[in-house]
Amino acid sequence: MKTLSAKPAEVTHDWYVVDADGKTLGRLATQIATRLRGKHKTCFTPHVDTGDFIVVINAEKIAVTGKKAQDKKYYRHSGYPGGIKETNFTKLIAHKPEDVLHKAVKGMLPKGPLGYAMIKKLKLYAGTEHPHEAQQPKELDI
């Protein structure tokens, strides 16, 4: 019996919608990263993008445990000397709720061209509405 190596043209990418309301940040991010990589499929091949499209709704209602809401820090840099900015979870979720989950999932994906292609298949929305009804996404219970 030979090992199956998936070809990019043979892979089908399904669409799933995930409701993040009340879910824990890290636990949800690991499940999403696994689906984006395609590790749940039998045809998983490390050098081929075999993952699915994931649409996340209610990103503003994601939860963290303990004191992470005040203690967890997020950094960004402008590119100029001394241009580092710092914010915490509470401020970031109020200003850009999609960025919290995006940063968590992006850190769990491989770095390089394949990882960049995988993160593009993640669609994040703060509310319940999303413009991907035409793709008929299936409900994914995580």
From Swiss-Prot:
GO molecular-function terms, A-Z: mRNA binding; structural constituent of ribosome
Alphabetically sorted, this entry's keywords are: Ribonucleoprotein, Ribosomal protein
Q: Name one Pfam family in it.
A: Ribosomal_L13
Q: Which domain of life is it from?
A: Bacteria
**What is one cellular component GO term in this UniProt entry?**
cytosolic large ribosomal subunit
**Alphabetical GO biological process terms:** negative regulation of translation; translation
Q: How does it assemble?
A: Part of the 50S ribosomal subunit.
What's its job? This protein is one of the early assembly proteins of the 50S ribosomal subunit, although it is not seen to bind rRNA by itself. It is important during the early stages of 50S assembly.
Q: Which family does it belong to?
A: Belongs to the universal ribosomal protein uL13 family.
**Know the name of this protein?**
Large ribosomal subunit protein uL13
Which species does the entry assign this protein to? Psychrobacter arcticus (strain DSM 17307 / VKM B-2377 / 273-4)
